[in-house]
Amino acid sequence: MRLVWIAMSLWLATLLLFAEGPGFRNRRTFDEHYAKHGREFGNISQDEYLRRAQTLRDTPSGGPILEADKPGGIVTKFDRRSGAFIAYNADRTIRTFFIPNDGERYFRRQAKRPE
């Protein structure tokens, strides 16, 4: 019974984590990205990391938000204010979210890459 409760709790936590719309492809991918890049944004929780990624993804381009569409329906954005970079699929599934070391130059290089 305890194992069933744990499994249901994990399932519910995953549902709540991704309830606001598409997040990463799956929980494992999300956990890996958070472990690798979460500290770049300060001492933030996984929920906050996902919220920031979704916010940048959903913010219209213009002003400090740069956007480039790539082949295969991949969209990249860069926020000049925070230095954050995101890449996501046409269905809004997040591929990556982090702060590149060379900021806007990274975004511009990625925009020119074929895929």
Where are these regions (language model features)?
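Eukaryotic low-complexity, non-globular regulatory regions
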Residues: M1-L16
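Compact soluble domain cores
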Residues: F18-G73
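Compact alpha-helical subdomains of small soluble proteins
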Residues: K70-R95
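A short, surface-exposed interaction/processing loop segment used at functional sites
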Residues: I86-E115
